[in-house]
Amino acid sequence: MQDRFLKSIAKLPEPLATAIVPLLDKDFAGHIDAQQLEVLQIASKMELNELLLALLPIAAALARPPISEFHVGAIAKGKSGDIYMGANIELPGEALFHSVHAEQSAISHAWLSGESIIEDIIVNASPCGHCRQFINELVDGSKVKIHLPAQKIEPLAHYLPYAFGPSDLNITEPLLTKQQHTLTLDSNDPMIIEALDHAGLSYAPYTKNYASVVLETKDGATYCGRYAENAAFNPSMQPMQMALSTMARHNRDFSEINRAVLIESSKGVISLVGAAMDALHSVAVVELEHIVVEPE
């Protein structure tokens, strides 16, 4: 079991703790599939909703909050029945808008894993306005069920009435809808090819700046992030932050980064290079490779 989960395990009921320990091996990064979840439910003798709330301390152990020192965990449950954990990330010395909220982390985890619908968000405190707006960008976002300790399960619309969202800007394919943007570049570099693939899957209906980041560690492992825009603009999730969140979930230290690539579309009305460089340089001493590509 990874050391980062030791304190969290102590907070779980003993039957659940015993059942989940085998999952928390060196490769665990916050994903529990539907079959594993069923095993945990049987072992713990908990109702599903009770179990999901009980697992929040495990999600919170994924957090890296050097500024607030406040660990927040969130879980996104997909239509597949799988659950995806996420946690808050803060970048040392950088402005607070560089932070990743736990709900963003969990949702991006589900998105990168191929989920097309998120049905439930489980979190240990009421989602902030920023996160409510981010959830609202999803397919059927207003219907996503919000689970909070000691509170009735309510749809997002309960927490965000009279919402402004993608439909108000005539967007008919919101976040989690499969994106297919063709970006071409003649390269045989596996890392650049990976970044191109993820940029083509990014969500940028408002600026058309389809973009992604791929980070490589010294052992050759890669961690990706896609740009995820929001109708309210500010809650948009930057690809660098998503990639760093992915690294954190996999228990990698940011000092292990030895290469970083940002790919973005030449047709976008903005550029993410400045924000990406600021975020990267707060955690690693490595130059950002910035590649602008033509969309087909």
From Swiss-Prot:
Gene Ontology terms, MF aspect: cytidine deaminase activity; identical protein binding; zinc ion binding
Keywords: Hydrolase, Metal-binding, Zinc
Protein residues bound to substrate: N88, I89, E90
Domain of life: Bacteria
Catalytic activity: cytidine + H2O + H(+) = uridine + NH4(+); 2'-deoxycytidine + H2O + H(+) = 2'-deoxyuridine + NH4(+)
Cofactor(s) demanded: Zn(2+)
GO biological process terms held by the UniProt record: cytidine deamination
GO cellular component, one term: cytosol
CMP/dCMP-type deaminase domain residues: 47-167, 186-296
Cofactor: how bound: Binds 1 zinc ion.
Function as written in the Swiss-Prot or TrEMBL entry: This enzyme scavenges exogenous and endogenous cytidine and 2'-deoxycytidine for UMP synthesis.
Protein name: Cytidine deaminase
